[in-house]
Amino acid sequence: SGGAHGEEGSARMXKALTYF
């Protein structure tokens, strides 16, 4: 994911990565 809030699966695991 590159900051997209559509991949809840990937974003949930690397939420911190997407946040920063």
Curated annotation (Swiss-Prot):
Where does the entry say this protein is expressed, by tissue?
Liver specific isoform.
- How is it placed in the membrane, per its record? Single-pass membrane protein
Query: What are the subcellular locations of this protein?
Result: Mitochondrion inner membrane
Biological process (GO), any one = oxidative phosphorylation
GO cellular component annotations of the record: mitochondrial inner membrane
Question: What keywords is this UniProt entry annotated with?
Answer: Membrane, Mitochondrion, Mitochondrion inner membrane, Oxidoreductase, Transmembrane, Transmembrane helix
Q: GO molecular-function annotation terms? A: oxidoreductase activity
Primary site of residence: mitochondrion
**Pathway assigned in UniProt:** Energy metabolism; oxidative phosphorylation
Assembly and oligomerization: Component of the cytochrome c oxidase (complex IV, CIV), a multisubunit enzyme composed of 14 subunits. The complex is composed of a catalytic core of 3 subunits MT-CO1, MT-CO2 and MT-CO3, encoded in the mitochondrial DNA, and 11 supernumerary subunits COX4I, COX5A, COX5B, COX6A, COX6B, COX6C, COX7A, COX7B, COX7C, COX8 and NDUFA4, which are encoded in the nuclear genome.
- Tell me, in a sentence or two, what this protein's role is: Component of the cytochrome c oxidase, the last enzyme in the mitochondrial electron transport chain which drives oxidative phosphorylation. The respiratory chain contains 3 multisubunit complexes succinate dehydrogenase (complex II, CII), ubiquinol-cytochrome c oxidoreductase (cytochrome b-c1 complex, complex III, CIII) and cytochrome c oxidase (complex IV, CIV), that cooperate to transfer electrons derived from NADH and succinate to molecular oxygen, creating an electrochemical gradient over the inner membrane that drives transmembrane transport and the ATP synthase.
The text of the family note is: Belongs to the cytochrome c oxidase subunit 6A family.
- Name the chain's protein: Cytochrome c oxidase subunit 6A1, mitochondrial
Which gene codes for it? COX6A1
